[in-house]
Structure formats: structure tokens, C-alpha cells
Amino acid sequence: MINPTTITNYDRNQRELEEFLMFCIMVAGKSAKQTAQKLNLFLSKRENNESPLEYVDALLHEELGINLEQAMRNVRLGQYGRLKKAFAGILRFQGHLHEVSVEDLESINGIGPKTARFYLLHSRQNVRHAVLDTHILKWLKLHGENAPKSTPTGKKYAMLEQAFLTYAWKYEMNPADLDLHIWKQYSQK
């Protein structure tokens, strides 16, 4: 099960990477703790020691007497259309999640810059990205950056990402540690 307070783990195996990527997709705009619990409940229905993506694939092909959307509704995951498209899309990375890039992930319907960077930042060592969620944006604004309230795109994302990485360097922290530190600080409020 995903533990949001210790999200960074560079030693995940393939099954753990599958679960973590599903969590990254699901958590957008939701409570991390609640999302982790719902994902755990969803995956607890697996049979025969299936990996998370093997389970999704079986549900998509209705091999278990239930389809993916029904299984998601049974545990109230929400955002059914978006999650179904994203989960189906990530099947192409099965067995290769150690190698995917931001661009690979962003090519999936339902995965944007924030989700792609979140996955990579907290699953691979020495990755230099910023997850510009509301917590990071508030923190950047507090530090004098012209940060909007919601996640920007394009050049604005790139500019704020660089600002965040500069602060990480200044504070002698890797970006994943600074991200988690800020998230813990702001998510408690």
C-alpha cells in the first residue's frame, strides 16, 4: 500500500511501480491518504497474484466477470472516464516503468505534467523535476515567485519548475526531499 508520508522510494519493483503510477494518476485533486486507501481497496480484489496492471488488463477485457468501470465504481474511485483512459493507456508501459520519460507519460490521456513529474520524482534517484501542485505553488509564491493558484502549463510551468529546482539547490536538498517536505508542511494545514 502507498504511504503518502513516505512517498519517495527509489527501490520499487515493477509491481510497486505499477501501483505507484496508478496512485499518481488517481491523487490529482484529492486527499493522498484517502486515495491510497481507495487504491488499496481496489487492488485488494485481485486474484491469482496479478500485478496491478495485469488486473487492470483483465478488467478491461472483462475476464473476471466484471469490467474496469464497474470495479472502480464498487470502491468509489471517482473520475471514472479519466481513470479508465489513463489506466488503459499505461498498459503499454507494463514491464518498462523504470524507463518511461515525462514525454512518454504525458502521451497518455489523463496524465499531465504534474502527474508525470510526480511519478518520476518519487520513483527515480537524481531526477530534476518539480511537481507544481497547490502546495508547491503556495510555497513558491511565499518565496517571491509569481506563481498562480493552479498548476500552469507550457513556458510558465517550465519557469516555475526551474525556480523550484534553484531553491532545492540553494537549500542543498534533492527535489524529491524538498517536494515532500513542503507537501507535509502544507497538507497539515
Residue ranges and their predicted role:
Residues 1-69:
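Structure-specific DNA junction-binding interface
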Residues 1-15, 19, 80-91, 98-100, ...:
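C-terminal accessory module of base-excision DNA glycosylases/AP lyases that mediates lesion recognition
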Residues 25, 29-30, 42, 46, ...:
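Generic structural signal for hydrophobic core residues of well-folded globular domains
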Residues 39-109:
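Alpha-helical ds-nucleic-acid-binding substructure associated with the helix-hairpin-helix region
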